[in-house]
Amino acid sequence: MSPIALLSVSDKTGLIPLAKALVNELGFKIISSGGTAKLIESENLPVTRVADYTGFPEILGGRVKTLNPKIHGGILARRDKQSHLDDLDKQNINPIDLVVVNLYPFVKTISKENVSWEEAIENIDIGGPTMIRAAAKNHQDVLVVTDPSQYSNLIDAYKSKKITPELRKKYSQQAFEHTATYDLTISNWIANQSSSKKVSWLQSLPLKQELRYGENPHQKASWYGEPEKGWSGANQLQGKELSTNNLLDLEAALSTLREFGYKNTISNPSYQKAAVVIKHTNPCGVAIGDSPSSALKRALDGDRVSAFGGIIAINCPVDEAAAKEIENIFIECVVAPYFDETAKEILSKKKNLRLLELKAESVQKADKNHIRSILGGLLIQDLDEPSIDQKKWKSVTELIPTDEEMNDLSFAWKIVKHIRSNAIAVASNQQSLGIGAGQMNRVGSAKLALEAAGTKSKGAVLASDGFFPFDDTVKMASDYGISSIIQPGGSIRDEDSIKACNELGIKMILTGKRHFLH
């Protein structure tokens, strides 16, 4: 008796070469339905339609096609159980040896703009997952394949007679993973369309890459991500393989950069061209400029010593002038929405430099959750998204910031939320001058930032991610000539800091919003 293959695929990639190999080289008979059968028939290959095999027509507009005992009995019957084989004989059911199924394109459907509820629901596959799960359960007798990338190995295994128990288990595991991911996608989409709170957090991400190691060489690490979303959608143009630390720094760079916008092309001359330099996930230089090269030079000038071995992110296309700013310094990675040909040619001389093109679309598609692990669980929170509402800011001192100072306060406020707490940023003329990160007390971070800025701090502004518990930071800021301070407020000693500002001639803005980063 010829082996039987059941083929029912939404993605028709590689279908005809597979069908030809099964029929012409391996002697299979093919059962199929719908568009899959139609395509096979168009190549004059023998195929039996599911409705002809089962004697039961498709009903409910195609909702019921393969949900039939003649299909599932043939898949689920164990060949080592005589009672199962007797049941097949009594019901005139043939055993099915190979199931090749992939599912309705639910992800593609819900990715469409303004997709309707009805269209999405109709693209929830029922028969496909049922066949896949049945075959995966009975993998000792039935091979199950769910992805066109598996076809070549499948045919090679048949031809070389290497259909081993291990291969069957491998395909079974991949099949269950396929249906689990599919169901999770549907569950999450429906949850997002309703107002009900999810009682469990479900996520399934494909393996993107095995990394060389984690933060340190003795730690193993892997990268999982949704295709075309976020960093999985980045195109690495050159350089060494990305490391765990590269990815963490790139994420920190992009998070900071998004405060100023992120576009593939610049059509509006007023668009803020910004550059960020990151070291150990902290910004060490941030600036806005009239051009990509100007923004980059000013960001690097913020702290050229710390920039050594860092990560650069630019929120607009990189041109020749910008590339020349990078040409003679040691940088691990550069990410931007686009590099022009001249820029790529200049930077190609730096063989180990990792260049990544990350399009705005990939950034926009990424999920807006911030996830961290704790022992035995996960903490999930909303991203601290770019958002400034100056209408809620309060000027609380006798002196009021000038328009220029307000622009710098807004700039510094955007930066400080991306510095590890306790965080202080000193800035002037849309350029960071000093960063104080990760100290256990706020005045310690202020000291680092002000010392880094040095004499440039005269007339500059200072931002703090949290309130001032005492007035010591204000007094230190005055010693360095700071003109204005922005901070959340909310301390029981706010009045002490405000009084100190008034005595020292410093302006202060309270935002009412904290930006801790742990």
From Swiss-Prot:
Pathway(s): Purine metabolism; IMP biosynthesis via de novo pathway; 5-formamido-1-(5-phospho-D-ribosyl)imidazole-4-carboxamide from 5-amino-1-(5-phospho-D-ribosyl)imidazole-4-carboxamide (10-formyl THF route): step 1/1; Purine metabolism; IMP biosynthesis via de novo pathway; IMP from 5-formamido-1-(5-phospho-D-ribosyl)imidazole-4-carboxamide: step 1/1
Domain MGS-like residues, every copy: 1-146
Listed GO MF terms: IMP cyclohydrolase activity; phosphoribosylaminoimidazolecarboxamide formyltransferase activity
InterPro entries: AICAR_Tfase_dup_dom_sf, Cytidine_deaminase-like, MGS-like_dom, MGS-like_dom_sf, PurH-like
Keyword Acetylation: no
E.C. number(s) listed in UniProt: 2.1.2.3, 3.5.4.10
A single Gene Ontology CC term: cytosol
Annotated Pfam families: AICARFT_IMPCHas, MGS
Domain remark text: The IMP cyclohydrolase activity resides in the N-terminal region.
Family of this protein: Belongs to the PurH family.
Name the UniProt record assigns to this protein: Bifunctional purine biosynthesis protein PurH
Source organism (scientific name): Prochlorococcus marinus (strain NATL1A)
